[in-house]
Amino acid sequence: MKKSMLVAASLCAMLAAVSVGGCGSNNTAGSGNNQPKQEQKASEAQEYYNKFVSIQMGISYDEAKTIMGSDGQQTQSSDTGNLKSASYKWDGPKGVNVSLHFQNGVLKSKQIMGTTSKAPKGKEVTMDKFNQIQTGMSYDDVKGILGFDGCLSSETKLFNSDQKIFHWHNPKGGFLQVSFKDGAVDSKMQSNLK
């Protein structure tokens, strides 16, 4: 039981550490001669995000390594009786990084940090929309309220329960974070919404 609590606490700590970042698509368009380079970097960040999203809970480190295209840097390792755990990090373009946590050789948690995505033109995340989101709603319900897809920033599979955290960002600041447990909203938070 102590081991289970320790594992749960460490995974909760990982989720709490998720940055305000979101999707891999960085919609900050450049001007003049810098635009092609910035677009290329945004495209690389989107590619990295797509790799992150395609990583499924329950796969092995070798499978994750194949998806990411390289070995990860080990950031944590422990062996406590019958529970072995290890965490790995991959650094991507423009400060983007992916962290994966394995228990007994199986992926249990993933997170991505360092990327941003803004609301599409004409869309905005508002306090009114935040207030419309209720516990128990599905992702599609939330997307319907907000008018666009959120960005998956973390996922944890623990004790037969799946927890996903998505972010929605405004172009001029402010964001909404929604946590889904087994496909239903279980918490939400916002910062600087009007």
Give short role names for the model-derived ranges.
Residues L11-A17:
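Secretory targeting and sorting signals
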Residues T28-G32, P36-E47, Q76-D79, K108-K129, ...:
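Intrinsically disordered, low-complexity Ser/Thr-rich linker and spacer segments
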Residues Y48-I55, S87, E124-I133, I165-H167:
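Second-shell loop/turn segments in exported
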Residues M57, Y61-V106, G114, T135-K194:
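A cross-family detector of function-defining hotspots
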Residues K2-K3, K110, K188:
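A general lysine-centric signal
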Residues K2, L6, L11, G24-I67:
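N-terminal, intrinsically disordered, polar/charged segments of Gram-positive cell-envelope systems
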